[in-house]
């Protein structure tokens, strides 16, 4: 019989754990709580919390809401969200990850700093991602977002650059962008960069590579919207081509299980442990 192992290092990061704990605590008191966006990029966990009374809303719905209680998830929000909350008498339950909060403050300080320098504030991140929207909001929309090294080539190298990163991005790609800017920026201006990638996320890359390489077959469990999930799954795939992205046991092709001796189950920072355990049980029942 095949050995089935769940990666101990996979599962929620502390920022997501805090957000979910806050949601559960509020729901146990009131039974109803709004959440601005999905609390986590995992549909199964979202459904579990919805059954407890959590109501996900978008920004348009938030703007129309009055006299209510709203949870802000770990990704963080731009300043406009807090202004709307005060105007509409909305009580905020702020679950912004402390790592994201520190980054927001750094970017805001850089933006409001009066140093008479014509500089570009650049954020390496995914355009439209909730965290990135919150970061760009600290600069009243002036920050430049780049998603990959190729996009860094269109920066104005005659102006100073301050480079930051979305907390869940790839450290390798960030370092490539840093090296490219160093090589191309004018000697008359300044370049400062801040490695703001969360170490709890970055450290998972070498660990998940090791885990994936130690199994014949790997099921990476993640919601399709998870940026971190995409990065970690790609790392699994690099070391073990027999890695498969799933978000539930229903997506497992039973033919993959035939003749396999070792099966690994791992996931993103937005993947609940209970879901990986559920998938492990389903696999064991089929082999």
Where in the sequence are the language-model features?
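The feature marks the mature, well-folded catalytic cores of soluble enzymes
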Residues: 1-287
